[in-house]
Structures are given as C-alpha cells and as structure tokens.
Amino acid sequence: MVPWLGPDDPFPPVERALGPATGAPGLLAASADLLPSRLIDAYLRGIFPWYSDGQPVLWWSPDPRMILVPDEFKVSPSLKKTLKRVLRDPAWEVRVDHDFRGVMRACAQAPRRGQRGTWITAEIIDAYSSLYRSGNAHSIETWHDGRRVGGLYGVAFGQMFFGESMYADVTDASKIALAALVAHLREHGLEMIDCQQNTSHLASLGGREIARKAFVAHVRRAVAEPPIPWQFDKRVLAALTGRTEPAAPSGIER
C-alpha cells in the first residue's frame, strides 16, 4: 500500500515507489498537505507532486526518469530558422520571471492530448508561487509584440532544474522558451533538466530516460552546488543557431 504522510512524516525511500506491474508505477506516497517545506524536501529527493482536484496530494518518483541533457538538445532545421528569426526581430522577446503565475495559469488551461482537466490546480499554483517568491521557481516566457505567447516554468535548486509544464499560443513559442532555457543552462554548466515522464515531444527534442538510481544520485550532487543567476534574454539563443546536431555525448549515465 502507498503510505499516508502526516504533516511531520518523512518521505519513504524512493525505492519503495510502486513498480511497473501496478496501475500507478512511480507512486510513492500520499498526503493532505502541499506545504512549501514539503515541496522543497520532495524536489531535493527527486520526488514531485501530481494529482487532480478531489484527490489527495500524490507524490511520485518514477523509474526510469525522463531527462533532457542541455548538451543533447536537438535543434531541428526548422527550429534553427525560427530562433534566427527571433534573434533578428525586435518584436520577439524572451523574458524571465516576468509573469510567473500567468505562465502557470496558461499551462493549466492549455489543452493536452488524452487529458481531461488539469493537474495544475489553484493549490499547485499557490504552492509553486511560494517557491517563486523564494527564488526557487522560474518562468521562461516568449513574448511577441508585447503579448506573452508561450513559456514554461520549473523549479531550480543549485545546479539542477526541474521542468514542470509548458504551453504555446503560437507555433514554436514553447520551443523558443525551452531553447532559451537550454542555452542559459549550458552557459552555466548545468548537466540535466528533469522532465519527469516520457513523451514523444520531449524525445524529439533530445530527451531520454535514465534509471531512477542514477537520477537521484545526480540530484543529490547538483542541488548541493551554488545556484546560478536567473537573468537572461533572447541573446542566449545565438549559441544554438550554429549547429543542428547535439554536442558530444555527456557524462550522464545512459
């Protein structure tokens, strides 16, 4: 059975998460609370919340884990062309932390194939907004003609970024935000973005799965490192427009 966590109960070891033969592989625990302290502790252990309205808070640590290594990010010819256009045209902007809650609300409202409703509830928005105020959550936003047209948000501790969700109101707007994030993280030597679960979209951009054991080991090392700055703009995209193939293989375990 999945353990129920009281306010003072610690998370069980991630190895106790439900396995692939169950109906909920990766489910580790449930609780009634989503306190900022609980949320921080979860991320530092490689755990994340995912649940719907009417459910308790469900905590997950899947095996394998989907990640994106910044140096393995795939820039297709069409995306490269888009990034060059964004760099040339002053109507396009990349803003960081300009409208964090707005990005979360837009992600909540974005239609998802095969998904009814959203897991980004008002409770989730409030909890992650608390992390944003403490400097541990960030939004990367694509703007065009003064209007926010796409973006993503996630959690950052030390040298680790945990991606949460993205949306696009116009073609490639979320990819522009992700490309800007990747370029910024590469510039500062971050080796991994947590993508939580496998999707064909992430795989097309260079995402891949690694064993949970390797993921958690990397998280423990990375979150102990000094944090990186979170001020940048669209000029970081220039680093991605010179090639279409990923860089040499990283040291992240396969």
UniProtKB/Swiss-Prot annotation:
First-tier enzyme category under EC: transferase
Record's GO cellular component terms: cytoplasm
Subcellular location: Cytoplasm
UniProt catalytic activity: N-terminal L-lysyl-[protein] + L-leucyl-tRNA(Leu) = N-terminal L-leucyl-L-lysyl-[protein] + tRNA(Leu) + H(+); N-terminal L-arginyl-[protein] + L-leucyl-tRNA(Leu) = N-terminal L-leucyl-L-arginyl-[protein] + tRNA(Leu) + H(+); L-phenylalanyl-tRNA(Phe) + an N-terminal L-alpha-aminoacyl-[protein] = an N-terminal L-phenylalanyl-L-alpha-aminoacyl-[protein] + tRNA(Phe)
GO function term, MF aspect, one: leucyl-tRNA--protein transferase activity
Tree of life domain: Bacteria
Swiss-Prot/TrEMBL keywords: Acyltransferase, Cytoplasm, Transferase
Main location, first listed in the record: cytoplasm
Enzyme Commission number(s) from the entry: 2.3.2.6
GO biological process terms on file: protein catabolic process
Cited InterPro entries: Acyl_CoA_acyltransferase, Leu/Phe-tRNA_Trfase, Leu/Phe-tRNA_Trfase_C, Leu/Phe-tRNA_Trfase_N
Pfam families the record matches: Leu_Phe_trans
Family label: Belongs to the L/F-transferase family.
Function per UniProt: Functions in the N-end rule pathway of protein degradation where it conjugates Leu, Phe and, less efficiently, Met from aminoacyl-tRNAs to the N-termini of proteins containing an N-terminal arginine or lysine.
NCBIfam families per the UniProt record, alphabetical: aat (TIGR00667)
Name under which the protein is recorded: Leucyl/phenylalanyl-tRNA--protein transferase
Name of the gene encoding the protein in the UniProt record: aat
